Amino acid sequence: MTYQAPVRDIMFAIEHLSQWPQVEALQTYSEIELDDARAALEEFGRFCGEMIAPLSTIGDTEGARLENGRVVLPEGYKTAYDQFVDMGWQSLSHPAEHGGMGLPKVVGAAATEIVNSADMSFGLCPLLTNGAIDALSITGSDAQKAFYLDKLITGRWSGTMNLTEPQAGSDLSRVRCTAVPQDDGTYAISGTKIFITFGEHDLSENIVHLVLARTPDAPEGVRGLSLFVVPKLLAGEGGETSQRNTLGCVSLEHKLGVRASPTAVMEYDNATGYLVGEENSGLRYMFIMMTSARYAVGVQGVAIAERAYQHALSYARDRIQSRPVDGSAQDAVPIIQHPDVRRMLLRMRALTEGGRALAIATGGWLDLAEHGPEEARAEAQSMAEFLVPLVKGFCTERAVEVASLGVQIHGGMGFIEETGVAQFYRDARILPIYEGTTAIQANDLLGRKVLRDGGRTARRFAEMIAATEGELSKGGAAAQRIAQRLAEARAAFAAGLDHLLATAGQDPNRAYAGSVPFLMLTGNLATGWQLGLSALAAEAELAKGGDAEFLQAKIATADIFAQQVLVECSAEHSRITDTGDSLLTASL
């Protein structure tokens, strides 16, 4: 199945929604210009379209295989990964001092979308490696950074995240994996980890596992978790690998989707591990990687939605079926001319471009939080932390919806595997689950991002949206409609926020029963806000004589989102505030 990277759409979002002038002005990115980002993404888009997208169907059909303890990916994956490494794509948004290209994180997020649109199974390997790089960059010792970062940033070595155990899923207080100190300063790691993405494979030269485990005298619960680097192959000071560590993949999961991404059950048998940071601080360190991975999984949602939309749009243009309801033609017409097919396609486009807008905006905040001037970092960090669970939770839930609509547009053919669109739906279904379910994101949003600061960041978020409404109200007819719907959605958000702040202390069960509706309401509002900003940018570009067809489509997409999606905020508000006794007391 063909894939065309939407670089023009992505670059429009980066230029107008990522606070690019502020990002570009950061000392870290002083030599980076918008054209550099465009050139990199255009080249990467070509690479992914030509080399990686053709693997998607093969990977789904054949899947990863476990052969005598060795995981083998389908034919073509190793060749594509070698070229991915040789061309430096893993290094795109990582620091130049460790061999990276040094582009902003928001550009890296765009690349994450492109590679995961091409093939989500392939894209998961660099995604987890990026998370390992982020974690070690912040928490690793100088020696660990010097030894591991350049190899991970090139992609020669890949990274994983080992949290989950059979008895410890979302509840990491139940982790039992042990880490026993050794005389040489290393630790002997023992235990079983499950659901480890790319835990074993044949793409990279080595695999660097980041493992949560307990030392013998560790406190109970999550306070007793420590983080360890546990490489598949032990390496000398020069990085040459020789001896295999005492760990291995004992089985692979048989999955609904992303079948070429090996999901491993890993067994550690006194494997040599190296402590990262301090003992009993592992969960705090791992949250760095988890935040990176959660944001990236939200971007995967945009990626699979884009792929499903491209496929559905192409099919709707070609499929001839039925005369138009208005009698404008006597013969059957392409189904794209039928009103409900248009409704579905335009909803797909609005949700996809809206998710991209939200993800790109969040990427800009992440860049400013990490590299901005000291006085501006606190607000940028607060906004980034507020938005990440929205990107993860909202964008992935919408991705499943978009993929489902793609199947629906294909009719009966969509239910046939050979058409290919069923794969998008199957691949998308994991997104609201792994790296923290939607409920986990909603609990994080409500508990850590709203209740912890008494709603201060949430209210600042609403203030920024109100300012955008003011600008939209001065624009054209579509912009004014968007402003009205944004104001209505913001009012629903404010009422829901006040209700949760008032309820949480008295009746936490009732408050948290509304946490997912609150996440979806906030996600709708945040996305509508960013699309409103997109419409304003498009109006400004039109006034300068820009491409009318492209820019008017941006305005129309924002308008459609406002009229078809933002109106759902009132229903989400009702779900938050009208949580009846039945929801909490009905027998199950």
UniProtKB/Swiss-Prot annotation:
Flavoprotein among keywords: yes
One family name in Pfam for this protein: Acyl-CoA_dh_N
Gene field: dmdC
InterPro entries from the UniProt entry: Acyl-CoA_dh-like_C_dom, Acyl-CoA_Oxase/DH_mid-dom, Acyl-CoA_Oxase/DH_mid-dom_sf, AcylCo_DH-like_C, AcylCo_DH/oxidase_C, AcylCoA_DH/ox_N, AcylCoA_DH/ox_N_sf, AcylCoA_DH/oxidase_NM_dom_sf
Job description of the protein: Involved in the assimilation of dimethylsulphoniopropionate (DMSP), an important compound in the fixation of carbon in marine phytoplankton, by mediating the conversion of 3-(methylthio)propanoyl-CoA (MMPA-CoA) to 3-(methylthio)acryloyl-CoA (MTA-CoA).
Effect of a null allele: Cells lacking this gene do not grow on methylmercaptopropionate (MMPA) as the sole source of carbon.
Disulfide bond positions: none
Active site: E435
Keywords carried by this UniProt record: FAD, Flavoprotein, Oxidoreductase
Family, similarity comment: Belongs to the acyl-CoA dehydrogenase family.
Reported cofactor(s): FAD
Catalytic activity: 3-(methylsulfanyl)propanoyl-CoA + oxidized [electron-transfer flavoprotein] + H(+) = 3-(methylsulfanyl)acryloyl-CoA + reduced [electron-transfer flavoprotein]
Protein name, UniProt field: 3-methylmercaptopropionyl-CoA dehydrogenase
